[in-house]
């Protein structure tokens, strides 16, 4: 229920972009939090209840508000929660519309999965789907909000590229970018 030092640079960048007249969109993972990011992990994350995830999301927004201004004005930051589009997703429709654009061989080469694949426990489909969901998040922000830049930690690089690739494949446009 608390941001960590790894979030600081992203928040500083969001603040600087906001000061320059841009409208930052902070995405919180009320949907992906149900799975947990396997990046940098040697074991599977424990699953949290919806109540804990929702509580954490509220805490994150409160903490982020100390850095960036949320509101309704032109360049006020906006908070989006991926639970809005992930929690009630139709699995078969999602696989037909989104899953078809992901190559498993390419996904397995991602840094986030290399160590896990080398271990005895391997990687579950549950965890592997995180990359697809994060890529879909960027696609939704691109489509719904006009967001064309995603930035995050270097441990998220493969997941962010999954988003730019999905946007290119679904829209035919090459104007979505990722930055660490």
Go through the PLM ranges and name each one.
Residues 1-177:
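NTP-dependent nucleotidyl-transfer catalytic core
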């Amino acid at each position: 229920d608390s941001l960590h030092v790894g979030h600081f640079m992203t928040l500083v960048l969001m603040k600087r972009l906001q000061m320059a007249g841009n409208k930052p969109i902070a995405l919180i993972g009320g949907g992906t939090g149900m799975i947990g990011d396997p990046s940098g992990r040697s074991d599977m994350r424990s699953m949290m209840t919806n109540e804990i995830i929702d509580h954490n999301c509220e805490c994150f927004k409160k903490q982020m508000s100390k850095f960036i201004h949320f509101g309704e004005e032109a360049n006020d930051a906006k908070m989006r929660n991926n639970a809005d589009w992930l929690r009630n997703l139709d699995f078969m429709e999602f696989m037909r519309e989104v899953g078809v654009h992901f190559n498993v061989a390419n996904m397995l080469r991602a840094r986030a999965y290399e160590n896990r694949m080398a271990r005895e426990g391997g990687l579950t489909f549950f965890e592997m789907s995180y990359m697809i969901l994060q890529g879909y998040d960027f696609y939704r922000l691109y489509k719904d909000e006009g967001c064309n830049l995603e930035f995050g930690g270097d441990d998220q690089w493969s997941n962010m590229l999954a988003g730019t690739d999905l946007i290119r494949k679904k829209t035919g446009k090459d104007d979505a970018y990722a930055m660490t």
